[in-house]
Amino acid sequence: GSEMCIRDRLKIAVAGTGYVGLSIAILLAQHHQVIAVDVIPEKVDLINQRKSPIQDDYIEKYLAEKELNLIATLDATKAYSEVDFVVIAAPTNYDPLKNYFDTSHVEEVIKLVRNVNPNAVMVIKSTIPVGYTESVRQKLDTENVIFSPEFLRESKALYDNLYPSRIIVGRPEGDARLEEAAHIFAELLQE
């Protein structure tokens, strides 16, 4: 039978608490246990006090009013070691002069997850160049990476996650486990 069942409560870590990460963390924390990971102590403290570190009406409202199974932490290693999914929403800075995406933050997360929890399925939500998921799988020697692009407007990020126009999850051909993980993740986003 299937190891992961959508009816089970899953444990999910979210790397990065910008618009993308925080809105996903809040969305998922309505039904699952979510650990939001950031490197900035002030942001972690605010989230744990149920205050939003960013300006977004829905995020502020949900943090204040909803019952969320959400904690924020600076301890990435511990967070990643005990979860089923790691949603990667780390910043990727685009350099227009070099026509280059700096994906180093994303890769740091992938390396750490691979080392502390090789079975966790990683879902990249960060903005990344075309073909990146495949190349990073080879470069970092891990299969467990899927990509789910975002269609969010700043300051409407949580709203757009609550009422998505579409949900896309990309994964490699012929890998049954990732195929299932992709379907589960898509369902999580629609609960």
Label the model's feature ranges:
Residues 54-55:
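N-terminal FAD cofactor-binding segment of flavoenzymes
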Residues 94-157:
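Rossmann-like NAD(P)(H) cofactor-binding subdomain of soluble oxidoreductases
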Residues 59-84:
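A structured beta-alpha segment of the ubiquitous adenosine-cofactor-binding alpha/beta core
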Residues 12-14, 122, 167:
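Conserved hydrophobic helix-helix packing surfaces used for dimerization/oligomerization
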Residues 135-148, 153-191:
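Internal alpha-helical scaffold of NAD(P)-dependent oxidoreductase catalytic cores
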Residues 7-51:
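NAD(P)+-binding Rossmann beta1-loop-alpha1 motif at the extreme N-terminus of oxidoreductases
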Residues 1-6:
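Short, small-residue-biased leader/transition segments that mark boundaries at the very start
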Residues 88-91, 126, 171-172:
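Glycine-rich, N-terminal phosphate-binding loop of Rossmann-like dinucleotide-binding domains
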